[in-house]
């Protein structure tokens, strides 16, 4: 390890000379005056290993050997960033399968509701076929039983025959009491 040997020497060096010793990459003052302080950096390493100082100064003025070219995947990367930005902003244009199923279920429900609300039988069946209200109600009940009201025939079918027989007998007894 080398320490300061000439600390007590009377010879003083200028700051430029000291920096020139520390960093040999700095241009000399004569070269600074020649270059008219124009910015000409190519952002390339100006001093490759094994190259002298003067050769490096000449390469800074020359254009780089390879022209700039985009990376092969730069377009893909930019597209993915734009997609993430749209998703964050809520502007996602992609339709997911969940969205498709939700839309189809809603459309199906709206079609069935419209069908069940319609009263004209001619819209539902082919012209020339006879269809009465009972057929239409039966068809609606078969498709969506929870949407159609129960008929009087179905109520009679649901009531057990024993309770139907008791009703007329109960009706006859009060009539006999009145006489």
From Swiss-Prot:
A GO biological process held by the record: regulation of clathrin-dependent endocytosis
Disulphide bond pairs: none
Region of interest called Disordered, as start-end residue ranges on this chain: 36-65, 158-179
UniProt keywords, alphabetically: Cilium biogenesis/degradation, Coated pit, Coiled coil, Membrane
Transmembrane feature ranges: none
Keyword presence, Coiled coil: yes
Ranges in a coiled coil: 75-98
Localization terms from the record: Membrane, Coated pit
GO cellular component: clathrin-coated pit
The keyword Coiled coil belongs to this UniProt entry's keyword annotation: yes
UniProt membrane topology term: Peripheral membrane protein
Task performed by this protein: Regulates clathrin-mediated endocytsois of cargos such as transferrin probably through the association and modulation of adaptor protein complex 2 (AP-2). Has a role in ciliogenesis. Required for proper cephalic and left/right axis development.
Binding partners and assembly: Interacts with AP2S1; the interaction is direct and mediates association with adaptor protein complex 2 (AP-2).
Record-given protein name: Coiled-coil domain-containing protein 32
Originating organism: Mus musculus (Mouse)
